[in-house]
Amino acid sequence: MRTQVGIVGAGPAGLTLARLLEREGIDTVVVEARSRSYIEQRVRAGVLEQGTVDLLDDAGVGQRMRAEGLVHHGIVLQVDGERHRLAMSDLTGGRTIVVYGQQELVKDLVAARLASGLRLRFDTECTDLVDLDTDRPRALLREADGTSSELECDLVIGADGFHGVSRQLVAAGSQVFERDYPFAWLGVLAQVAPSCDELIYARHANGFALHSLRSPTISRLYLQCTPDEDLDAWSDGQIWDELQTRLGVSGWTLAEGPILEKGVTPMRSVVAEPMRHGRLLLAGDAGHIVPPTGAKGLNLAIADVAILAPRIIDFLRRSESSGLDDYSDVALRRVWRAQDFSNEMTLMLHSNPDRFEDKRQQARLRYVVSSEAAQRSIAENYVGLQLA
Ligand code: DHB
């Protein structure tokens, strides 16, 4: 097979990039190691920044997101059992976020690609990327039945996530910056109407808890746990009890329902600099991951491809390579802003085994809920700074 741009990974980054390039008449092939049903079902993030929503709309894949996504104008911060609403839209000149599950967005992008009759290979693993320093890089592929093939390209985009082959190849020649956190999230998806119209980020002596949602009938809830937490040690009843404790305020109870899905989300910050090796460019989690607090991961993936798409087009149409040369620097400025924000939100909201840090972060959270200046800073980062 041959194409102009080979895209490894059919997550939000790879599929959105393919869509942006399709609109400009650039030929792409997307290969994905997993099955279609796997990527369309897996429960991931759910908060889209205004800029992400606008980009998806402009790319012609926003109809269902606009119809079914839930627009939010504020979030709630809970400290010492008291709730404080952070009026995001009022603090940011009217900007909002939209709650819409990542897997719903993936479904929309897959449907759009297939409707355009364009190449998208599921169950096709990229085992290696070779000749990256030549003008004919190749992706070596293996299908589920063991058949091998090759995809020859002008450029390869590594959008195959944190565990993919692209990140490993780039990391070998890049600087990698990392930070581990002494916590993780136990997340559940529950078949019950959300108990509050807005997201609640709660700090409690037992640990952080988050009330989120996916639809008027589905709640998404998280509990701070340890990185090596044994999920099997938690019964559904214990999960609900702990959520009630950490999210509880007087006069309010969390509605409970069947748990549809549960998992443990690790927390790490990782950045590869530069996000490039020859003709391989990284986008999304392949290049960087952030801890989940503040919901920046998916939004960064979309921001990467918004920065990358016009640079690829200039390169392929006019042999103009300066855009590709500065892609990493431009994208990483936003990535580091998000690393700082996600790190700050994570530390401020989680109970910390370091007792000094724990006290300091409690003081910070109390300051935030009492200061409009501090709230404005969180709000503008939360709704998303301008793309690029
Ligand atoms: C969700 C995840 C986040 O990391 C966050 O900060 C808010 C909401 C969610 O999955 O709904």
Task: Please tell me what each predicted stretch does.
Residues 1-13:
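Beta1/beta-strand and adjacent pyrophosphate-binding region of the FAD-binding site
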Residues 22-43:
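Glycine-rich FAD pyrophosphate-binding loop
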Residues 41-44, 49-116, 339:
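Active-site-adjacent segment of FAD-dependent monooxygenases/related oxidoreductases
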Residues 111, 118, 124-128, 133-263, ...:
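Conserved FAD-binding catalytic core of PHBH/FMO-like flavoproteins
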Residues 208, 269-271, 287-298:
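Glycine-rich phosphate/pyrophosphate-binding beta-alpha loops
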Residues 266-282:
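FAD-binding beta-loop-beta segment adjacent to the flavin cofactor pocket
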